[in-house]
């Protein structure tokens, strides 16, 4: 009996020792610190990839800001140009008070016959005419090479033919300097009327009567008898 009890106690002690060693080896194999370290190395991104991502994000943000700025500048420029055009049109069309000339009181435009006598030139950037600028102040558009420009007398300011013709249908002044064109138109129309009068005056007819010649024989007889 004693031998059996000793053998069973020895087997039990051996089993407990074996189980303890197994558990300790298992704990060594499954070290939580090593697992966390491996996970950290596996999850942590590369510094180079992070830098490239940050750089791409900065470039996209910078491009977005530049595009938005350009769009805002273009929109603001368009709004200012439209406002300036409206203001200029209003100032040009506003009648001038206190003028003693007929230009201040007449709403009738220039006679078409006189208007057609104003010179028209073909615009070229190389032209150096006094008073001719680079844009039409009526439509606020730059002159283009080959466009027909009508020049006003006296002030020599130039405008698009379609713009100045429409303007002078209702006004008698230059839209840029307000020079009155009534006197010039009257002079042109006066020259026209004088030319018409000269053309309409009938020329005096001169009647020349030629007497028939007498026969030569009769003349000789008359001379002998005398």
From Swiss-Prot:
A zinc finger (RING-type) spans 136-178. The keyword NAD does not apply. The chain crosses the membrane at residues 60-80. GO terms for molecular function: transferase activity; zinc ion binding. Disulfide bonds: none annotated. It is found in: Membrane. It is an enzyme of class 2 (transferase). Signal peptide: none annotated. The keyword Zinc-finger applies. GO terms for cellular component: membrane. Its EC number is 2.3.2.27. It catalyses: S-ubiquitinyl-[E2 ubiquitin-conjugating enzyme]-L-cysteine + [acceptor protein]-L-lysine = [E2 ubiquitin-conjugating enzyme]-L-cysteine + N(6)-ubiquitinyl-[acceptor protein]-L-lysine. Pathway: Protein modification; protein ubiquitination. Keywords: Membrane, Metal-binding, Transferase, Transmembrane, Transmembrane helix, Ubl conjugation pathway, Zinc, Zinc-finger. It comes from the Eukaryota. It is a single-pass membrane protein. It holds the Pfam family zf-RING_2. Its main location: membrane. GO terms for biological process: protein ubiquitination. The RING-type zinc finger domain mediates binding to an E2 ubiquitin-conjugating enzyme. Belongs to the RING-type zinc finger family. ATL subfamily. This is RING-H2 finger protein ATL75. It comes from Arabidopsis thaliana (Mouse-ear cress). The gene is ATL75.
């Amino acid at each position: 009996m004693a031998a059996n009890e000793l053998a069973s106690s020895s087997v039990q002690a051996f089993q407990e020792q074996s189980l303890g060693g197994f558990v300790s080896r298992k704990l060594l194999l499954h070290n939580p610190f090593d697992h966390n370290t491996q996970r950290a190395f596996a999850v942590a991104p590369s510094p180079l990839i992070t830098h490239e991502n940050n750089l791409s994000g900065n470039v996209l943000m910078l491009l977005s800001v530049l595009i938005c700025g350009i769009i805002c500048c273009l929109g603001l420029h368009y709004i200012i140009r439209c406002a300036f055009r409206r203001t200029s049109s209003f100032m040009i069309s506003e009648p001038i008070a206190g003028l003693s000339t007929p230009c201040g009181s007449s709403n009738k435009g220039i006679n078409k016959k006189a208007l057609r006598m104003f010179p028209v030139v073909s615009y070229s950037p190389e032209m150096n005419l006094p008073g001719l600028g680079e844009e039409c102040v009526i439509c606020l558009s730059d002159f283009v090479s080959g466009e027909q420009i009508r020049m006003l007398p006296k002030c020599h300011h130039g405008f698009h033919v379609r713009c100045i013709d429409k303007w002078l249908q209702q006004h008698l002044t230059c839209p840029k300097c307000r020079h009155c064109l009534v006197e010039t138109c009257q002079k042109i129309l006066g020259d026209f009327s004088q030319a018409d009068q000269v053309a309409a005056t009938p020329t005096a007819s001169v009647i020349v009567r030629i007497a028939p010649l007498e026969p030569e024989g009769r003349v000789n007889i008359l001379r002998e008898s005398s």
